[in-house]
Amino acid sequence: MAVQGPWVGSSYVAETGQNWASLAANELRVTERPFWISSFIGRSKEEIWEWTGENHSFNKDWLIGELRNRGGTPVVINIRAHQVSYTPGAPLFEFPGDLPNAYITLNIYADIYGRGGTGGVAYLGGNPGGDCIHNWIGNRLRINNQGWICGGGGGGGGFRVGHTEAGGGGGRPLGAGGVSSLNLNGDNATLGAPGRGYQLGNDYAGNGGDVGNPGSASSAEMGGGAAGRAVVGTSPQWINVGNIAGSWL
């Protein structure tokens, strides 16, 4: 809860745990010296979230709602387990431009992914992989990447020869293989590897792409899906760039 008036002194102690105004000012990121304690009103101490469990179906809308609920409070998210978007059609994380938080820090100690694209089938090319981060708050997003930030791999292209059709492999991570009416399906991708396209003699559907890479075309020249992007939108403040698969800014 932010510092409130009219009893600013007791309010800042409750918010920061600091009895001395100078120490409370540091906790509340008040940099002016000298300062009036009235400048504490509306400010909050940094909130720290620890994410220690893997989530392979993460929904960005949940995170947006939680951040909005904090108002102007800055939030630090320590990501200590792998996170994957629930669909290649949505990024793993999205930070809309109207988020009220003073700043948001991502300390990434694991791998975070856009989801891999679905493999194509018959005359259809592979589907694109999902993006990882959509940032529309500029440098209010701070990224300390000690793990991997990955766009999802594209799905492999399908093929059809005569009445025979087969599915391409899913893009890494967790992209679904293309499903054929003849049950000649592409393999689903795992967290660690893209799926293989169905092989039928000299004909084949395309393999799914690894993270940050497009899927492969089939022998019938149905193209693979485009790679998902790692970071899209406006440039964040990079504390540490680290390992990235896919385009970023």
UniProtKB/Swiss-Prot annotation:
One of its GO terms (cellular component) is virus tail. A motif (GRM 8) lies at residues 204-210. The lineage of its organism: Viruses, Duplodnaviria, Heunggongvirae, Uroviricota, Caudoviricetes. This is Receptor-recognizing protein gp38. Its main location: virion. A motif (GRM 1) lies at residues 114-121. Receptor binding protein (RBP) that is at the tip of the long tail fibers and serves as the phage recognition site for the attachment host receptor OmpC. A motif (GRM 6) lies at residues 184-190. A motif (GRM 4) lies at residues 164-172. It comes from Salmonella phage S16. The keyword Transmembrane does not apply. The keyword Disulfide bond does not apply. A motif (GRM 9) lies at residues 213-218.
